[in-house]
Amino acid sequence: MSLFTLFLLALVQGITEFLPISSSGHLILLPNLLGIEDQGQAIDVAVHVGTLGAVILYFWRDVKAAIAGTPRLLTGRIDTPGAKLAFLLIIATIPVIIFGLFLEVTGIYDSLRSIAVIGWTMLIFGLVLYWADQRGGTEKQSDDWSLRDAVTMGLWQAVALIPGTSRSGITITAARFLGYDRESAARVAMLMSIPTIIATGVFAGAEVIATADAQTARDGAIAAALSFLAALAALTLMFRLLKSVSFTPYVIYRVILGVILLVIAYA
């Protein structure tokens, strides 16, 4: 894989992973629309490692609290904010693991990796995000995250396995419907991404490690570093903008891209 292709894929993954515009959809589209080679599983895992590092660093205080609370959780005690956060993150991740295994075992996932599917999901879930953002309340903050809300958002997150949906987009949508303000909705959605990315990496990482060579390791390291920097920049920018801007710019982008993709798919 050329350095230019590697740079492009890592940059796109880093920028789109946490913005509500679907990273998987963009990574599937790049090879199809630009005629570049598919990144392969090794690079896919590497860029996810990079984005994982970025979100952990950005939310290190929350991550540290969840780690510190895990021993208490293992003894059945959910009596600290950290233990509660760790518990709710686990609960919210269960649906996506179950649905992911179902799609993998049945082979359905491969049939969903098409321009038409991505076009429809970009368009439909972009409009749903707009609806949720306009009608959603602001009475809840991230500290109000409850078991019921974790289950609800976890079920919505599972739908994001359909390419083009956007994991962050659909969990933010769910949070806005549940009454979380914009910053809190994004914060909870980003925290939910951590165990989800880890789970995805565990499934794919073992095979990659077993078959990796020196070239793959070099490309993976470059991709991880680039996606880390891009993701960290995207997170910083998004949360700064959310202080004064709604999710409408992301919706407009999704609708325009969705329409273009549908025209390409059905032309």
Swiss-Prot record:
It is a multi-pass membrane protein. InterPro entries: UppP. One of its GO terms (molecular function) is undecaprenyl-diphosphatase activity. It is an enzyme of class 3 (hydrolase). The keyword Endoplasmic reticulum does not apply. It catalyses: di-trans,octa-cis-undecaprenyl diphosphate + H2O = di-trans,octa-cis-undecaprenyl phosphate + phosphate + H(+). The chain crosses the membrane at residues 1-21, 40-60, 85-105, 112-132, 189-209, 219-239, 245-265. Bacitracin is thought to be involved in the inhibition of peptidoglycan synthesis by sequestering undecaprenyl diphosphate, thereby reducing the pool of lipid carrier available. Belongs to the UppP family. This is Undecaprenyl-diphosphatase. The lineage of its organism: Bacteria, Pseudomonadati, Pseudomonadota, Alphaproteobacteria, Rhodobacterales. The gene is uppP.
